[in-house]
Design a protein with these regions (language model features):
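Src homology 3 (SH3)-mediated interaction modules
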Residues: 1-116
Length: 116
């Protein structure tokens, strides 16, 4: 799916949490904000800064511990209006996008429109 950026977005998290499937997590508070982004949790993983992880990526074991159900990176893209992006996945109000150059990352869906 191709998108065009409609509003600038700047990441506030320079050190995004990056998880590997099966990696242990400590799940903290649920994000509550005016944006309406549902089911994001502040999580910690060994050796990393805390970061937000969407509920579908958080699994629970029989003892109540948490783990990553898939590989995941919380990297957000810095984008500007008019910029084209290729969307790979949407999750909980965000799109994982690939810019024309540079690394992929998350952008809020509210700052995107479908191209074409």
């Amino acid at each position: 799916m191709n998108y065009i950026v409609t509003a600038a977005h700047r990441s506030e998290f320079p050190y995004p949490i990056t998880l590997h499937r099966g990696q242990a997590l400590v799940v903290g508070e649920r994000y509550e904000g005016p944006e309406g982004w549902e089911d994001w949790y502040l999580c910690e993983a060994e050796g990393q800064q805390p970061g937000f992880v969407p509920a579908p990526v958080i699994g629970r074991d029989a003892q109540g511990g948490a783990f990553a159900t898939e590989d995941y990176c919380a990297r957000e893209l810095d984008v500007d209006p008019g910029q084209p992006l290729r969307g790979v996945r949407t999750l909980n109000g965000w799109a994982w996008c690939v810019p024309e150059s540079g690394e992929a990352g998350w952008v809020p869906l509210e700052k995107l429109r479908l191209a074409g």
